[in-house]
């Protein structure tokens, strides 16, 4: 056999000899290597790109973007979503929103000058499932769906990202980066695009880049995010006053292939 990754017949033989676990691990390793190589290639291109290439830096909602309005007990948050760069996260979020999954859920974790987090039916950070859980094992085997990391999306102030319990464990929980601290001086333009470094001067959490799927950006309503971030919390970062999502209205949807 030339390779278990290129010939299905060889893969079958390998499965017989060494078992599914071994072959699946090798397939995953190969897929991860290819993804890393592709990301490195795209990152080099992104470093040379102009501002127009970074959708978070434009408040207008483009044709290939979606838009939602998160109505909370503290006010509204208007967000645009990026299916081009994070199709799984956007489809998951939009579907949950349309089905009312998030209605009534609380912001269970709030850390001022960091982020606000919601999307857990349990209300304590332990729950939440993707739309594919129990339905499509290729997208979610039971632990969540994969991270989608793009050199064109970052954890700048106002960005919407998937919360996870480790790589590729995305379910339904999400957070909005709220920090207003200037992090630009700690970033190198050899690794981060200059326009993004400038954006980080207004806040965000660059330490989260590469570990969490960014899939949206607040285009209005950051005052609501700041209001939520300023409430009194317990030692476990849970608001003493319950803050809930009333509803999430899909203003502009997206047709997935």
Regions found by a protein language model. Name each.
Residues 4-7:
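Bacterial Sec-type N-terminal signal peptides, specifically the leucine/valine-rich hydrophobic h-region
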Residues 10-257:
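Cyclophilin-like peptidyl-prolyl cis-trans isomerases
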